[in-house]
A protein has these predicted regions:
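A detector for short, charged/polar N-terminal pre-domain segments
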Residues: 1-5
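Short basic helix-loop element that most often maps to the first helix and adjoining turn
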Residues: 8-25
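Residue-level recognition of specific faces of alpha-helices
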Residues: 9, 23, 34-37, 49
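Recognition helix of helix-turn-helix/homeodomain-like DNA-binding domains
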Residues: 29-43
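DNA major-groove recognition helix of helix-turn-helix/homeodomain DNA-binding modules
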Residues: 48-64
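Short acidic DE-rich linear segments
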Residues: 67-69
Length: 69
């Protein structure tokens, strides 16, 4: 998944839940700028940050590991 697509998913879910960037920022401890940059695909967040955001937004993430031939 591309960072832009990830950001769109996070932003769309946040809006469905009627949450502000500020509220998401308070929960995750990330700055509003960082949340905005993630939503706009301007940064590539670490997996632990994505996990924390997904937890708050009640989203599930599935990681699939495949062997490259």
């Amino acid at each position: 998944m591309q960072v832009e697509e990830l950001g769109k998913i996070i932003r769309a879910r946040r809006k469905v839940l009627n949450l502000t960037i500020g509220e998401l920022s308070e929960y995750t401890g990330l700055s509003r700028t960082t949340i905005s940059d993630i939503e706009l695909g301007k940064t590539n967040p670490r997996l632990d940050i994505i996990t924390e955001i997904f937890r708050f937004l009640n989203l599930e993430m599935k990681i699939e590991v495949r062997q490259i031939k």
